[in-house]
C-alpha cells in the first residue's frame, strides 16, 4: 500500500511536502491506520506523530485521514481507503503544525477552557457525594464522553476562520454538559458567558463535527 504522509518541520523546512512510502500489508489483514503509520515509521524513523492508548480512549492520535478527521487507532484501512487507493495522512487542519502530524493544541484547549468545563456548586459541601436520580444522570449521556481529540473543532469552518475566538464544538458540548447537570449551580453564569458572538451564535449548523466525532457525540 502506498502511504502519503505530510512532512513539515517549521524550524528547518521552507514549506510542507507529502512523502510517499510503500508499506507491505499482511495478506487478509485489515489493519488500523495507526498500524500502517507504524509500518511507515519503520522505513523512516523521522516521521513524527502522537499516539498512546490504541483504543480510541486518549484521543492523542487525531489526524486527517484521506480528507476526513479521525483517530488513527480505530480507523481501519478498509474504511479509509478505496480498493487500490492511497492512504493520505495529514495533521488536523486549522491548528499550527509542530512537526509532521503533530499539531499545537494550545488554541483548542484555550477555547475549551473558556466554558469552565468543571462542576461549580456553591452550596455547602455535603457529607457524602452530591446525589442524582437515575433520570438526572441519564441526561448527561452523550455529553460527558468527549476525549478532547479535537477532530470536531478542526473540522469546523467557523473554528478555521476564528480559532482564537470561537469556542468550537468541543467547548459548546461541554458547556451544555454542565448546564444539564443537576448538581451544577452556575447556570446563569454559564449562559451569560455564551452570549457573545463567538460562542453559540458562531455555530452555523454545518455538522462536520458530528460526522467525524469518534464517540458519536
Language-model features: locations:
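Short structural boundary motif marking the start of a folded domain
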Residues: 1-3
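Short polar catalytic/cofactor-binding loops
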Residues: 5-11
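Short, contiguous acidic and Ser/Thr-rich linear segments
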Residues: 18-31
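Short strand-turn-strand beta-turns centered on an Asx-Gly dipeptide
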Residues: 24, 64-68
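Ferredoxin-type iron-sulfur electron-transfer modules in oxidoreductases and energy-metabolism complexes
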Residues: 30-46, 87-217
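Short, structured protein-protein interaction patches enriched in aromatics and acidic/basic residues
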Residues: 53-62
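Glycine-rich phosphate/adenylate-binding loop and adjacent beta-alpha elements
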Residues: 68-83, 87-89
